[in-house]
From Swiss-Prot:
Membrane topology note: Peripheral membrane protein
UniProt: ATP binding residues: 37-44
Gene3D superfamilies, sorted: P-loop containing nucleotide triphosphate hydrolases (3.40.50.300)
Gene field: ecfA1
Protein name, as recorded: Energy-coupling factor transporter ATP-binding protein EcfA1
Known role: ATP-binding (A) component of a common energy-coupling factor (ECF) ABC-transporter complex. Unlike classic ABC transporters this ECF transporter provides the energy necessary to transport a number of different substrates.
Main location: membrane
An annotated GO cellular component: ATP-binding cassette (ABC) transporter complex
Enzyme Commission designation: 7.-.-.-
Domain ABC transporter, chain residue ranges per copy: 2-237
Gene Ontology MF terms in the entry: ATP binding; ATP hydrolysis activity; ATPase-coupled transmembrane transporter activity
Keyword check for Membrane: yes
């Protein structure tokens, strides 16, 4: 689905260290991948490369077999949707309904069909009761859920969540993570979560760890958590449950609360 071959990107030619430094990776269709790293690791730059907002100076990028080029930019962007960190920067419509409908207006569908789709995707993010509300009356978490619905309505093959919970309170964060898990279970989508939060990354099938513009590790969440050197290099905070389980003799470290309780009760 997504393939990078030796991709390098600098914001300025004079930059000694590239923001993305000779990165090669592959993400298969239907995978849920977390791209994990501390501030300045290059993960958000990578997300902008994937949606063709930034062009690599070196290397190759393929989306669904299509190589990135100026000629096929439009085709590539149709395949990928992105939800950004700040919910205030992506609310376009004057109401929730208008915002979800915005992208559908270029798809040549009837008003009735558009309305049906708006309601359908509002339900996915639990915002169907707020369709007439204006953005200033919504919480940050609600705005982020509307942004997710707006992307889902466009039906992209790949959805990128770029630090989508970092500006939310615990309640808003929990709800958005719940929706991401629901999309993973119900939709035939390739999901990419850009995050510095291991609690969010452990939901993924595969974790790609970045530090100083380089891909330094790849594996399952458990594999990554067991690599102390990688945790240190990437400045990742391990989940609370994992930290507890690691210090209990005779218990295999786990980040799943139910697994920890089960092992303790044996």
């Amino acid at each position: 689905m997504i393939k990078l071959n030796n991709v390098t990107f600098r914001y300025r030619p004079s930059d000694e260290n590239p923001a993305i430094n000779n990165v090669s990776l592959e993400i298969k269709k239907g995978q849920y991948v977390a791209i994990l790293g501390h501030n300045g690791s290059g993960k958000s730059t990578l997300s902008k490369i994937l949606v063709a907002l930034l062009k690599p100076q070196k290397g190759e990028l393929f989306i669904d077999g299509i190589q990135y080029s100026k000629e096929n930019l439009k085709e590539i962007r149709k395949k990928i949707g992105i939800i950004f960190q700040n919910p205030d920067n992506q609310f376009i419509g004057s109401t929730v309904e208008d915002d979800i409908a915005f992208g559908l207006e270029n798809k040549n569908i009837s008003r009735d069909e558009m309305r049906t789709k708006v309601v359908e995707y509002a339900k996915v993010v639990d915002m169907e009761k707020h369709l007439s509300r204006e953005p200033e009356y919504l919480s940050g978490g609600q705005k982020q859920r509307v942004a997710i619905a707006s992307v889902l309505a466009l039906d992209p093959e790949v959805i990128i969540f770029d630090e989508v919970t970092s500006m939310l309170d615990p309640k808003g964060k929990s709800k958005v993570i719940q929706i991401i898990k629901q999309i993973q279970a119900d939709k035939d989508k390739t999901l990419i979560s850009i995050t510095h939060d291991m609690d969010e990354a452990i939901l993924a099938d595969t974790v790609l760890v970045f530090a100083k513009g380089k891909l330094v590790a790849a594996g399952s969440p458990k594999d990554i958590l067991n690599e102390e050197k990688i945790i240190e290099i990437a400045k990742i905070a391990s989940p609370f449950i994992y930290k507890i389980s690691k210090h209990i003799n005779g218990i295999e470290p786990t980040y799943v609360e139910e697994e920890l309780i089960s092992q303790i009760c044996k």
